[in-house]
Amino acid sequence: MASTLTSKPQRLALFENSASSFYGTPLAPSSIRVQPTKAGAKPSISMSGAPSPPYDLKAFTFDPIKESIVSREMTRRYMMDMITYADTDVVVVGAGSSGLVCYELSKNPSVQVAIIEQSVSPGGGAWLGGQLFSGMVVRKPAHLFLDELGIEYDEQDNYVVIKHAALFTSTIMSKLLARPNVKLFNAVAAEDLIVKGGRVGGVVTNWALVSMNHDTQSCMDPNVMEAKVVVSSCGHDGPFGATGVKSLRSIGMIDTVPGMKALDMNVAEDAIVRLTREIVPGMIVTGMEVAEIDGAPRMGPTFGAMMISGQKAAHLALKALGLPNALDGSYVGGIHPELILAAADSAEIADA
């Protein structure tokens, strides 16, 4: 049977008539040169690509493009993403420090993950530390997650400090968005939930700017994303904060959202991880939104609980999907399961 060592990837039918190079610009063919050798010596073969032309910055010119091509390339890809993720495995609402750490989900290539973020710039409050300062404090043992990401820090006895919070956020974001089974829909808000038979089955979406201007127009209906599991990581109260648990309260699936209590770092971070859970069938709550629903203290500018809460939420989602996870011991990988195994009684409320 004949076989080939290389094969050209098949193009999607959608791109058959496109003149763009979806699979990348082909490299210039290499030239192979056989050097003459003396008798008995092995031939010497050298390979070199076509030389790159020198840049003339006084007469720099880009390759030409038709304006409509730019529009079509953006539109086609975004529309294909909307079609692909209209019915997905997991929707993560909120791409802050806890939501981004749900990148644990993306390690399983069979899990399709859509991330919805109302802001143009994902990251939530994790671009800075407290009071607009740049350093990010992470209490041990959450520094083990930073080791996994390869993020450098200044180590102290009980905590570590990243020189700039943006280093953490940009690193995890780049790792997450590079995965083929993840799509970030930023500038998109989750206005409501899909609920069927007492189970959350997705989210109702709209452009964030539309959500902010419903009172100025007569009718701007939303769109939907169905999902097997919804992870709500919308943060503490605010214009788009704690929207997941607020929606549950408005439709009667939970009774109250008492809001977070006064700051106590030592109580707060442990409580956030412990109380991260599937709050109603089909919906997991993580990060500071946990404090809103359970009346836990706020933690202030420490970020370890955000990271470990996000890890725990990811493995709760994997468990809900019937996939290997650290919670039941079926997961095989580099995670530190001791960080996320803290169980939570669904009726437990954190004390300030």
From Swiss-Prot:
Gene encoding the protein: THI1
InterPro entries listed in its UniProt record: FAD/NAD-bd_sf (IPR036188), Sti35 (IPR027495), Thi4_fam (IPR002922)
Subunit relationships: Homooctamer.
Pfam families: Thi4 (PF01946)
Top-level enzyme category: transferase
Binding, substrate: 98, 117-118, 125, 190, 221, 236, 288, 298-300
GO molecular function list: cysteine-dependent adenosine diphosphate thiazole synthase activity; iron ion binding
Cofactors that this protein relies on: Fe cation
EC numbers: 2.4.2.60
Swiss-Prot/TrEMBL keywords: Chloroplast, Iron, Metal-binding, NAD, Plastid, Thiamine biosynthesis, Transferase
Catalyzed reaction equations: [ADP-thiazole synthase]-L-cysteine + glycine + NAD(+) = [ADP-thiazole synthase]-dehydroalanine + ADP-5-ethyl-4-methylthiazole-2-carboxylate + nicotinamide + 3 H2O + 2 H(+)
Family of the protein in this entry: Belongs to the THI4 family.
Other facts: This protein may be expected to contain an N-terminal transit peptide but none has been predicted.
Protein name (database record): Thiamine thiazole synthase, chloroplastic
2,3-didehydroalanine (Cys) modified-residue sites: 219
